[in-house]
A protein has these predicted regions:
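Terminal alpha-helical anchor/extension segments at protein ends
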Residues: 1-161
Length: 161
């Protein structure tokens, strides 16, 4: 009888805010490659600066604000799509970071046929550099919370049979 080869699970931790994402890949319990992506989303600062010019003509300012908003949303979406492009073949995803960006990414992941249902944890986290993002990913995937998640998932799969 053939012995089943246990393939290593491909896991990824994604730390992100509006401008940056770190994607930490793991095979089994080992950290593989770590990718840093930077978004094209314009920062708020530039928007604030634009205000002075348009203050005199209120409606023009609003139009411009709407355009900027629209452009930012499109840029954000393409940033999330770029992140998704780095997640092929990932079995388990851990999303963490400050602010709202992770909600947008989570939403897009759940609409993706290959990745929907693969997010195992979704947490608020502080600003981090790459090294800290690696440490947090490692801590999550080697910790009890993830072990418990897998135990529960096995039970659920058995129950479904």
């Amino acid at each position: 009888r053939m012995k089943k080869i246990k393939s290593l699970e491909h896991k990824a931790g994604i730390w992100l805010d509006q401008e940056t994402a770190y994607i930490v890949h793991m095979e089994g319990d080992a950290v593989g490659k770590v990718e840093g992506l930077i978004s094209d989303v314009e920062s708020r600062a530039r928007m604030a600066g634009e205000g002075k010019v348009y203050a005199r003509f209120g409606h023009t300012f609003l139009d411009n604000q709407e355009k900027t908003q629209h452009r930012q949303n499109n840029q954000r979406k393409s940033f999330f799509k770029e992140i998704l492009g780095h997640l092929h073949g990932v079995n388990f995803l851990y999303l963490f970071g400050p602010g709202k960006a992770r909600y947008g990414l989570h939403h897009l992941i759940e609409k993706d046929q290959q990745l929907a249902g693969h997010v195992v944890a979704f947490e608020a986290a502080d600003r981090m550099n790459k090294r800290e993002a690696v440490a947090a990913t490692l801590a999550y995937f080697t910790g009890d919370q993830f072990k418990q998640y897998k135990k529960d998932r096995r039970k659920a799969l058995k129950a479904a049979l």
